[in-house]
Amino acid sequence: MAAVHSTGGRAAENRVALKGHDFSRAAKTPIGRAALAAEGMRVLKDTFPQGLKPIRFYSAAGGTAKAVPFQSAAVLVALCALALLTGCKPVGPNYSRPGYQAPALYKETGASSVIVPPPNPAGGAWTAANPSDGMLKGKWWEIYGDHELDALEDRIDTTNVQLRQALETYLAARDEVSAARANLYPTLAAGPSITHEKTSANRPLSSSASPTSYNDLVLEGEASWEPDFWGRIRRSVEAAHATAQASAAEMANVSLSLHAEMASDYFSLRGLDAQAQLLKDTVADLEGQLNLTERLFKGGLDTQAAVAEAQTQLETVRAQLVDVGVARAEFEHAIGTIANYDISTFGIPPAPLEGPLPKVPLGVPSQLLERRPDIAAAERQADAANAQIGIAVSAFYPTITLGATGGFESTNPGTWIQGPSSLWSLGAQATELLFDAGQRHALTDQARHTYEAQADAYRNTVFSAFQDVEDQLSTLRILEAEAGVEQQAVAAAQNSFNISDASYKGGVTSYLQVLTAETALLQNQSTAIGIESRRFVASVGLVRALGGGWDATQLPK
């Protein structure tokens, strides 16, 4: 629809003749527009979005002649009533966290499983987490009391590229929330237009009093708003917000994984340092044994076979030492990469694996749902999928758009920004899809199935999390028992070696018996070191399985 506005400065008789006329009808035809132009009226191009049918108010110069399709008061009341409808409840199902099965206590602590309904007393997506004082908090790696590990861990948060990538992904998701929320508000635009126009002197209904050349100065603004009657926009905001929270949880999970991998690699490296030191000490002992055997052979007190056996054992242990160096270099490179060091110059001086293994506070299984970021991410993704159902359902309802324009138009700069040059209009449009061959039904069903799939993914993440904790607990329990047995084996092997070595030096036994005893001692000592290193790595695995001190209250609101 075109809008007709006064340009001013026309004969009074023309204004009287036009009084009460329906300008909008005349503006629809070329002849009518020409007639209006001849009487000092201007037809503006519609500045509303395409397809919008606005309610127009028309006025002639001086405001004498006017045609109002609807009473302005009634229109404003109707628009206000429509605006109030934006507070209606959004269509589609409201979200509640999927049900899950949680044990009362972990199996490794000796309690049975019970079915727990999804805790949601306040109607929110999460129950309030109440971590006890004994729970892991913040820099959990500090419980190991290793300052070099602390320095490496602290570097991750500021330098790791993978973590920065996760941060940028979260920030992009957060921006999507802002973009979705902006759709709740009107859009505003404004701009001037200054043109000089010439019309044909031979146009229909022209007169000698009608100018053929004139200026057209327009300053106009417009506003457009889609009231969220059915909640489509609110559901979009809900989906974007849940997706952003899922992204934040995934970022926390990346951070947890990196810190845990750093600690695991570090303790594995320290275990190899201990293995290397053991092998170096063994090489020194075997070199002494070889020298002794060679002297005895030269004195006729031992055989050449004993010398060969001593030489073989020495070279075997030297080869093992080289192999440990290969594995250590790989862990050192992995640590340098995680901490974003230049691995061509990065190095960690050898040091023994020291300190008692710290106790990791468990909490109760129901708290695990609030403490693991991967569970939080899966749950938030389920929320986002649920919101998509509401978006799909809203397609069954009409789309309503409100619009308004206002400004000034004149042929004379001196009268441009004045009351008689003002123009304004209000409009509304409702669009309802009548036939889509079942597309909306299909999209709604798709959204529901997507939600169910995401809900099952959440449940699977929960079950896998409990398995992860139980695996780490059982590993720690078994390794602790194995460490005790292995210490006894080391003590027995040490005693056997001492006896054999003394007997050999006293000429009572052959070197083969010493060699057998020393091989058994080396194997048991190496096994003991490996068990201790695995216990530290399993301890880190338990920390990771428990969420590393994170909890769902850290999600952005």
What is each residue range found by the language model?
Residues 300-303, 465, 472, 507-511:
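Alpha-helical heptad-repeat coiled-coil segments that mediate oligomerization/polymerization in large
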Residues 93-98, 105, 138-139, 144-155, ...:
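Small/polar-residue-enriched beta-strand and adjacent coil segments characteristic
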Residues 297-301, 504-508, 545-549:
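A short glycine-centered flexible hinge/capping loop motif at secondary-structure junctions
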Residues 368, 402, 430, 447, ...:
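Hydrophobic, well-ordered secondary-structure elements that form the walls
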Residues 84-158, 206, 217, 241, ...:
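Terminal intrinsically disordered/low-complexity segments used for targeting and assembly
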Residues 1-87, 117:
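Intrinsic disorder/low-complexity segments
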